[in-house]
């Protein structure tokens, strides 16, 4: 009897420990409903000087004049329009998580998305981002960028307390398909490395420029200026009237952000030693 009780106690301990070290879901959204939920997401505030409401040739929608993006058929529809009712520029979207994600033992991001346009000169972004405290240029960032100019691959980039600019770019081809197809994009952000995956295939690992501060998650779409020649197209210009407006979009099927469980023996940290079950029967 004592042996049975001892075994039950050990099993309970093992189950409890496995629960403690299991990855935790921090944000999940499959975008069911008619619009993106304000309990999970927001767009920039125009009055904030650090909100980045203008990038390239694009002004992002902001809370004072726009609603959150629509959802359709289980997808968030992230749009950029050629007509901007408030200025002569493109009118884009920068959807941001309400949460900020601290590195801890690691963060794992999984996004299923596709671009709905092949018109050259448009960029769709899937990324983590944060300006450094007190700065408007130094920042941390880990990203996937989908360029309609280069539809058969995706640009990856990373910054660690670096100025806005070129960063540390690596362009990777898709294992199959193009930006017009749904793909699963993953970022695994560890304390000592960052890995990018597409459709389960490892496409890049970075061990040098690894950010450590908390970051917010973004989904955006915008039109760059000539300062980014690989992504810019001089033939794509803002519309001068609502009647000539064009709408371009990225569909996001789901977002899943979770913590990464602490390392195990495979990464050099020894697990709890196995327990010897002794027969305690008198």
Feature roles, as predicted:
Residues 1-4:
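Positively charged n-region of N-terminal signal peptides that target proteins for export
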Residues 7-16:
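Bacterial N-terminal signal peptides
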Residues 24-281:
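GH16 jelly-roll
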Residues 6-7, 116:
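General helical structural elements
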Residues 17-23:
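Sec/Tat signal peptide C-region and signal peptidase I cleavage site
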């Amino acid at each position: 009897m004592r042996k049975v009780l001892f075994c039950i106690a050990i099993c309970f301990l093992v189950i409890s420990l496995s629960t403690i070290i299991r990855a935790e879901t921090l944000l999940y959204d499959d975008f069911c409903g008619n619009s993106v939920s304000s309990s999970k997401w927001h767009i920039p505030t125009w009055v904030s000087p650090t909100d980045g409401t203008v990038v390239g040739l694009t002004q992002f929608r902001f809370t004072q004049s726009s609603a959150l993006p629509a959802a359709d058929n289980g997808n968030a529809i992230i749009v950029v329009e050629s007509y901007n009712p408030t200025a002569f520029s493109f009118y884009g979207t920068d959807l941001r998580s309400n949460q900020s994600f601290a590195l801890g033992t690691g963060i794992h991001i999984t996004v299923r998305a596709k671009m709905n346009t092949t018109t050259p000169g448009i960029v769709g972004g899937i990324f983590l981002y944060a300006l450094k405290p007190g700065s408007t240029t130094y920042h941390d960032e880990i990203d996937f960028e989908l360029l309609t100019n280069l539809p058969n691959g995706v640009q990856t980039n990373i910054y660690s307390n670096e100025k806005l600019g070129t960063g540390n770019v690596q362009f990777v081809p898709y294992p199959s398909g193009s930006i017009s197809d749904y793909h699963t994009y993953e970022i695994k952000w560890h304390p000592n490395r960052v890995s990018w995956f597409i459709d389960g295939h490892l496409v890049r690992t970075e061990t040098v420029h690894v950010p450590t501060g908390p970051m917010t998650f973004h989904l955006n779409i915008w039109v760059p200026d000539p300062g980014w020649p690989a992504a810019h197209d001089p033939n794509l210009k803002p519309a001068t009237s609502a009647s000539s407006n064009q709408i371009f979009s990225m569909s996001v099927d789901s977002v899943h952000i979770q913590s990464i469980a602490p390392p195990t023996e495979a990464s050099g940290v020894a697990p709890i030693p196995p327990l010897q079950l002794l027969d305690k029967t008198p």
